[in-house]
Amino acid sequence: MTFVEFFTKATTTPNEPQGRQPYPYQTVFAEGDSLPELLNVPTGVGKTATAILGWLYRRREATPKIKSITPRRLVYCLPMRTLVEQTRDCAQEWLANLELSETVGVHVLMGGADASNWDEHPEREAILIGTQDMLLSRALNRGYGMSRYRWPMHFGLLNNDCLWVMDETQLMGVGLITTAQLQGLRSKLATYGVTHSLWMSATLDTSPIRTVDH
């Protein structure tokens, strides 16, 4: 299946029975030999679809070479709860259209809605969508709102074999700098499986992601 066919099927709705066509930059993301670090595009042209459907295509339909450089887990980090809910709804709808709901899990990590069982099957592909406090605290081995005895599990799973996507970075504050430093340390110290970070915004300022190790 080509990415155009994949994207069209995923975006089919009652109002758009033929689905939508991807923009050229979305196709480049899905089919490219490497993943970008920055995505700076205007509001309303599909950043969320680029990250989720692009990652999903690379894992499920692309060549073995592309799959091998695409992390097993997609970690979608957002600054606000409402954005988490919107992104979750989109991901679930796209997976249902693609008939992948049973094979790729969507798990939400935010206050009051912590997905407590997402770590039970680390071998499976998964989409983790959460607020930056929940996700970054776990990546720092200080998991907010969870037993400290489970901190190392989430620390390991969120720092290995993951594609971290930071969306609406202009709203993240110091969390943005933390994401960059974490990626710098992963690159410096090495990880199990490919671990990559992507920063996305319509008003992307790259200065905060230049840190001591990144």
Q: Language-model segments: which ranges?
A:
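N-terminal helicase ATP-binding lobe
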Residues: 1-214
